[in-house]
């Protein structure tokens, strides 16, 4: 049995609160059970040097965990003087995932930065970050359109992510920390709304997994992501753009 009594295919309760802070063009607090991430989308004119003059935009991301988002305090990476490898890996994953959501040519020479700050961690912080950041990105793109700077939103598709894994020999969707830390296989799946996959990260922590188990986990992720896309759509229906 799972820690909270969920079915193997069931995702945690999801809450997506838009317009969470007032300054960012897009701001979302996303909650997957006890995992809580603040996702802000900031719009700036101009693009990185390697894109100048190409008539396209850029989407990038930064990720961090507050010192007491975990069971014991972790020093801020700024205090240590450098980002850890895990942090850099996750923020690159978030950026790659959200770039897939946008037609960068239609965005024009704007840069959108997605800042994902983990307030409370209980597993799945990177997948929650992608899911929440996509909603913040939609609001930021709509702000550019509302300001008359773009004729239409360059959004191509919603993007969401979920973790799956094998725990005690059972495939499970949306792992909590206690499940993640005990998983024989751990996988993160990033998907577009039409079912096409952007990224699959899978690791066998103990016994290697079979091809059939891989397909089973991907099917489990696809089912969970349908619920997550529903949560995104429901959030975007609420609260008129501020």
UniProtKB/Swiss-Prot annotation:
Q: Does the keyword Nucleus apply?
A: no
Q: Name one GO biological process term.
A: rRNA catabolic process
Q: What is this protein called?
A: Ribonuclease PH
Q: What's its EC? A: 2.7.7.56
Q: Which gene encodes it?
A: rph
Q: Which InterPro entries match?
A: ExoRNase_PH_dom1 (IPR001247), ExoRNase_PH_dom2 (IPR015847), ExoRNase_PH_dom2_sf (IPR036345), PNPase/RNase_PH_dom_sf (IPR027408), Ribosomal_Su5_D2-typ_SF (IPR020568), RNase_PH (IPR050080), RNase_PH_bac-type (IPR002381), RNase_PH_CS (IPR018336)
Fetch the PROSITE patterns from UniProt.
RIBONUCLEASE_PH
The highest taxon in the source lineage is Bacteria
Q: Which GO terms describe its molecular function?
A: 3'-5'-RNA exonuclease activity; tRNA binding; tRNA nucleotidyltransferase activity
Q: How does it assemble?
A: Homohexameric ring arranged as a trimer of dimers.
Which family would the database say this protein is a member of?
Belongs to the RNase PH family.
Its biological purpose is as follows: Phosphorolytic 3'-5' exoribonuclease that plays an important role in tRNA 3'-end maturation. Removes nucleotide residues following the 3'-CCA terminus of tRNAs; can also add nucleotides to the ends of RNA molecules by using nucleoside diphosphates as substrates, but this may not be physiologically important. Probably plays a role in initiation of 16S rRNA degradation (leading to ribosome degradation) during starvation.
Catalytic activity reads: tRNA(n+1) + phosphate = tRNA(n) + a ribonucleoside 5'-diphosphate
